[in-house]
Structures are given as C-alpha cells and as structure tokens.
C-alpha cells in the first residue's frame, strides 16, 4: 500500500498547486446567485457520457439557478484521482464511486450520509442491492442509478445438442457436478474442446466481481463478514479451496477459451460465456434466436452472483448538499434511470424503472439479472475499508490459480496478506 499512498500524495500536491495558482478558480456561487455544482463522473461508454451530459443539461434547465460543471475522469485513473483530491481537500460536491471502493472514502470521513437529504419515497424505491451497497455503519452514503448483472450466457442449440437441462431461475441452477458434466459433454462435440469463456482477457476488478461468488456459493468468502477482521479460515477454508479447484480444473482440462480477441462467444467458438450484462447487446446481435441467460452454477450453498456498480455520493466539503441531493434525485427519476439503462444496458436502479424496462421487466430477456438483485441471490463485495487490499490480493490469487499454482497454497498466502493489511491499519476502526 505504500507505493499507492505515495502516488496519491504526489497527485494531491499537484491538485493543491493547481488550485492555489489558478486566478480564475470559480466560487461556489456567482454574483447573480447561480449555484455552481461540481460533479465528477467516470468516463465510461460514449453512450453513458452522452446521456449524463444531457441529464446535466436538463437538470440545469429545470432548476434555473444551478450551473452544473461536469468533469469526466478516465475510468482506469478514477480511484487514484479521487483519492488524491480527497487528500488535498479538493473533492467536488457530487462524485461517483466504483462499488466497494466507497467504504474506504467513508472511513476517511469524506462523505455525507444521504438519508436526511434524499426523499424517503425515492430511497424505498431503490433496488435492495443498491441500498445494501450504499449503506455503511447503518447510514446510507451512496445510491446508484443502475446495478450490474452477472450470469452465464449460452447458445440454446449447443445445450439442446447434449440434452442439458435449462434452468430458468437461480433456484434451478446447475449443481457444480452437473456443470462439470455439461462442460465435458460440450467439449466432446467441439473440435478444440474449448467451450467456456471466463473473460480471462479482462483485467482488474473483474476477477473479484466475477469469481468471488464462487466462494460464497461454496460456503466460503473473501473475509469473515461478522466483523471484517479475518480472512484466514474463510478465504482459505476447505470449501474455498475445493471451489476454486473446480475453476483451475476447467482451465487445465482445456475447456476455457483464452478469448484474446474478446469474440469467443460472438464467433461461436464457445457455447457458454461467464460475463455481465454489458455483453448482452453484442451477444444478442450475434445469436438473435439462440441466446439464453442462465444463473451461475451452485457450488453447494445455492447459486450466487455479483452486484454493485458506479454509485453517487456527496462530499462532506460540499457547500450545497441540498442542491447536490436534488441533482442525484433527478438522476434517479424513472425516466432518467431508463435513459441511462438503455444506454449502458445495466439493470435499472429502482423498482419502478425495472417494471417499465423492456429488457428487465416481467417478460424481459434479462429479467434474471433483476430477480437476482431483488431476491438476495447477489452478494455485495465486502463492505469494509480494507476492500482495496482484499481485491488486490484476490486478483493476484486468481492469476496464480489460472496458471496452475497450488490452490490451497495461493489462498493461504492471500489470506495472510489481507489479515496483515487489516492489522497494519488497526482493524480499520469505525468511521472517523
């Protein structure tokens, strides 16, 4: 963590220098009474940026006396820049956070609780996964316009060819034994035997988001969630080792396509793709009448899946928290939620918007994703300031496991390093 901290400090000094030297730095309120609201967002897909920019314009027009200055920050650099701004005391009024990284900012004391700023009717309409993600130490600190979906996309024709059962919901998910048998049968009918895409071409947080549900489905986890003080005995227990041994076995058996061009499923090289909602549009275009969405396999304690995505919070240094809350409330109106969901394909963040959604409504092709979030199948990543250390260690462990290193040894080392980080930070005591 030392190298990260040094990087944040350097960026913070640069930000402080820029602020001190800028003679044109704007005040929060202009002479004509217009309130200037600073908003930071991640520079995601172009369609997302265009929708958010249009939302900012509509909000400013409706409010009349609020000028929203929207700044997009590259996604890869986002967390580092926000952390640097926090150290420099230069956070904007409103800003996004990537899912579980939220809790470290809360712990540092940078965010305001939202429960007294947002309408109660709006909060009660949020998906339970959204409020779970945004709640820390019994306070709501963030809300999301959308959430994510994680599952298995499949070609129905390939499954029919081997007589595979088609689960229609998480309760009917394939057992791990059944899934292993399906992989074997698919491989027998495939020339190169590669039948599963795990998006090994992805990087970073994908591996924690995409594969920690394997642990939870097996009865293990990344950390003991009772007090978030120990990974030992949880991340490296026998259930965790057995679960991730299955994953290593898939790779060793040659079932997993490395998918270097990110086109294995689209091109028909594999029958199954373990991925999130964002792949749907391309997959549907490639297989318009042959595409299925299925739950992840059950490793013994029920099918589990991931949750969490970008979410909005208000900085403690904001001079206009009520106006900031009005802006967030505007983004969470049904029409605006649907505009963003239609742009990025994600699960709408409110129940009202889900019901009006073409893809996620009762008869929508992606309804499984919404059901998983509303029915408790999805698992939030650990709600602890230690999460940056946890995910870094799990990502390292995943890479070692995929390359054949002993699973038990790898998980032992990861658990030890996570616990050492927690110890080094005095257990991450309650928010300052």
Question: Could you describe each region identified by the protein language model?
Answer:
Residues 3-8, 13-104, 122-123, 260, ...:
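Conserved N-terminal structural module of periplasmic/extracytoplasmic solute-binding proteins
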Residues 76-113, 123-142, 152-153, 158, ...:
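Pocket-flanking alpha-helical
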Residues 153-156, 307-320:
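A bilobed periplasmic-binding-protein/Venus flytrap-type ligand-binding module shared by bacterial periplasmic
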Residues 97-151, 207-210, 214, 292-297, ...:
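Hinge/lid segment of periplasmic solute-binding proteins
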Residues 180-187, 220-258, 284, 296:
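Glycine-centered hinge/linker elements that transmit conformational signals in sensory
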Residues 51, 156, 191, 329-351:
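Periplasmic-binding protein-like
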Residues 137-145, 150, 177-229, 270:
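Extracytoplasmic/periplasmic solute-binding protein
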Residues 291-294, 342-400, 424-432:
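Long, aromatic- and glycine/proline-rich binding clefts that accommodate carbohydrate-like moieties
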